[in-house]
């Protein structure tokens, strides 16, 4: 199976690293990582990726410092080009950023299945751009990985049990990452 992972914000790299480790340990998945550049930071150099055991992106789109609409639109165009080139079975997105919604929309429009990690989380404040991204990404996803029972409940309250998608309570991927890095920090340098 081939999967594209979309990341753009720093926390998404930490989450993606935890999931990538699980892919390598338990599954035969070819993972292609796209960094949209949403939160570009010169400090996220090779050392950052090496020290935190984060897989380096295969593609860096370098899209940042734009309005929400311009950023999301450019991300969709660039992600679409990679999807067409790589032909994945799934596109995996995390959380609620512009990278999340751009990846989900690009995949869905190309009839590629969308997997959303951290699905069902809600602030119930639709004035927040992140809340709009969460709701829309959940609506178009095929597989929804929820970190909590409350997240599953939110999806059920929104009628997701009547939508053709899979809802899975998987726990908090950030907790998995914290446990991994805690053990790593205990090792002598």
Segments predicted by a language model, with ranges:
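Residues at the starts of beta-strands that form the adenosine-phosphate
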Residues: 2, 30-32, 113, 166
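Active-site donor-nucleotide binding/catalytic segment of nucleotide-sugar enzymes
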Residues: 2-22, 170-189
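Active-site and donor-binding regions of nucleotide-sugar-utilizing enzymes
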Residues: 4-6, 13-22, 48, 60-162
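Structural beta-sheet core signal
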Residues: 5, 33-35, 116, 169
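Cofactor-binding loop segments of dinucleotide-utilizing enzymes, especially the Rossmann-like FAD-
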Residues: 8-9, 36-38, 119, 172
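Acidic-histidine catalytic/liganding microenvironments
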Residues: 26
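Conserved nucleotide-sugar phosphate-binding/catalytic loop shared by glycosyltransferases and other
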Residues: 29-71
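A nucleotide-sugar donor-handling region in carbohydrate enzymes
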Residues: 39, 43, 140-189
